[in-house]
Amino acid sequence: MIALMAAFLLSTNATPRELVESCRSMVPKTVEIDGRIILRNRRGIPQAEYAYVLKRLDGKTDLILKDADGKPVDFERQGRILKTDVTWSDLTLDYLWWDDFSFDAEREAESVHGQVCAVVVMRKGDRTVRVWIDRKTGAMMQAEEFSGDRPIRRLWGTRIRKFGERWMANVLEVETVGSGHRTKITVEELK
């Protein structure tokens, strides 16, 4: 019902707020996600791999990372996680809750994977993220983080899957621009 309402709202001239609210509504308030984070070189050869469990309960999020032997790994929430391209923001999509956002007028109606998207620029302090949102479904299709006026990281979904009643990206790619490698995030289980 919510997705149907979102599709109806977004088929008209939705405001940036309506688009962002639609994205927010697709992120469960309480969820546990199990998956893998795989750092790969330019040729796609794995360089490092970690299992993760992301738990979100009433807006509070916790992340557990494990190495190949299943042992917990310590990491910093600031910056890249364990030399991968992935950041805390990639896993939690925290920028969707920033309050300063507007349309990117220069990128009106761009397509991502054949879907016409609105492009919304989100800001918090000195951080800026550009988000492509599908005009029909209100789903986030990709995001770019900026340093000044140049993109430094990109995130995009490559596959979607239905978990119970919820459709979501189950394979995402994250790239630090110019690094020569990418990191794949997989979602194996959603509880």
Regions found by a protein language model. Give the residues of each.
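Gly/Pro-enriched, hydrophobic low-complexity segments
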Residues: 113-191
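Intrinsically disordered terminal and processing segments
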Residues: 15-16, 22, 26, 56-57, ...
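Amphipathic hydrophobic-ligand
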Residues: 45-51, 151-154
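An acidic-aromatic
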Residues: 48-95
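One face of beta-strands
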Residues: 33-37, 52, 61-63, 172
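Short, exposed beta-strand/loop patches in secreted or surface proteins that constitute
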Residues: 51-56, 103-111, 131, 158-160
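N-terminal leader/targeting segments and the immediate start of mature chains
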Residues: 2-45, 57
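A short, amphipathic edge element
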Residues: 17, 95-107, 151-154
